[in-house]
Each structure stands twice: as structure tokens, then as C-alpha cells.
Curated annotation (Swiss-Prot):
Organism this protein belongs to: Orf virus (strain NZ2)
Protein name (Swiss-Prot/TrEMBL): 10 kDa fusion protein
GO cellular component, as recorded: membrane; viral envelope; virion membrane
InterPro entries assigned to the protein according to its UniProt record, in alphabetical order: Chordopox_Fusion/A27 (IPR003436)
Signal peptide annotation: none
């Protein structure tokens, strides 16, 4: 038996126009549609990344605001306690 027997049984990768190509005839997506979907997914990923970054920045700002409000409330509570006689300065 010769080593080259069966060498050309599979279609070549650049033979996408052939309707007898088993992969494309079975309904698999074409190279162009895969590229379009990949570009779409990359755009979506970029949009989501930007949105998460903005949300993170807003959350950091709110956390700092919350901390400053907490500190102000503790100071006010201490002031009220001193003025009402519950604690000493």
C-alpha cells in the first residue's frame, strides 16, 4: 500500500465555494459570519468594560460620600451628647 493513498480525501481549507464541502454543507457558519460575530462580541465586550469602569468610579465616589456622612453623623452625635449632658468633652 502506498503512503499517499487517501491523501486527497479531505477537501482543502481554501475550497469554501464547493457545495459538496461537508462542513459548510452541514450548516456550519462561514468564515465571514464567524468574523462578524467575533467583531460584534468584541464591541460588546468593550462596551461592557467601559460601563463597568464608569460604574466602579461612581461606586467609589458614593463610598467616599457615605464615609464622610458617617463621620459627620458621629461628630453630630458627640456634640448632642455633650450639649445634653450625656457625656463630657
Amino acid at each position: 500500500m502506498d503512503e499517499n493513498d487517501g491523501e486527497n480525501l479531505l477537501t482543502q481549507p481554501d475550497d469554501t465555494g464547493n457545495s459538496t464541502n461537508g462542513v459548510y454543507a452541514a450548516g456550519a457558519p462561514t468564515k465571514e459570519s464567524v468574523e462578524e460575530r467575533l467583531v460584534s462580541l468584541l464591541d460588546s465586550y468593550k462596551t461592557i468594560t467601559d460601563c463597568c469602569r464608569e460604574t466602579g468610579n461612581r461606586l467609589d465616589r458614593l463610598e467616599r460620600h457615605l464615609e464622610s456622612l458617617r463621620k459627620a453623623l458621629l461628630d453630630l452625635n458627640r456634640k448632642i451628647d455633650v450639649q445634653t449632658g450625656y457625656s463630657r468633652y
